[in-house]
């Protein structure tokens, strides 16, 4: 395994640990999710380039589209929560309330 693959896996692991440690604020959780998605994108692109599998070349772009949709929904949720409650704590999100 090359050093580039190890760095990308380490970036994913650091983002995952950050998501598990700093899950009290919505903004930090969203940033960690973005780091995870970007490391998955780079890993998928490198894997497809190394394997010369041209049929799957659209997969990283589709992953990037879903990451952009996730970021837009996350930021709209952040704006809604901060306008409603005044903070961005994840504890304020309760699925039993409308």
UniProtKB/Swiss-Prot annotation:
One of its GO terms (biological process) is ATP synthesis coupled electron transport. It catalyses: a ubiquinone + NADH + 5 H(+)(in) = a ubiquinol + NAD(+) + 4 H(+)(out). It is found in: Mitochondrion inner membrane. The keyword Phosphoprotein does not apply. Keywords: Electron transport, Membrane, Mitochondrion, Mitochondrion inner membrane, NAD, Respiratory chain, Translocase, Transmembrane, Transmembrane helix, Transport, Ubiquinone. Pfam families: Oxidored_q2. It is a multi-pass membrane protein. Its EC number is 7.1.1.2. The chain crosses the membrane at residues 1-21, 29-49, 61-81. GO terms for molecular function: NADH dehydrogenase (ubiquinone) activity. It comes from the Eukaryota. GO terms for cellular component: mitochondrial inner membrane; respiratory chain complex I. Belongs to the complex I subunit 4L family. Core subunit of the mitochondrial membrane respiratory chain NADH dehydrogenase (Complex I) which catalyzes electron transfer from NADH through the respiratory chain, using ubiquinone as an electron acceptor. Part of the enzyme membrane arm which is embedded in the lipid bilayer and involved in proton translocation. PANTHER family: NADH-UBIQUINONE OXIDOREDUCTASE CHAIN 4L (PTHR11434:SF0), NADH-UBIQUINONE OXIDOREDUCTASE SUBUNIT ND4L (PTHR11434). Core subunit of respiratory chain NADH dehydrogenase (Complex I) which is composed of 45 different subunits. This is NADH-ubiquinone oxidoreductase chain 4L. It comes from Bos mutus grunniens (Wild yak).
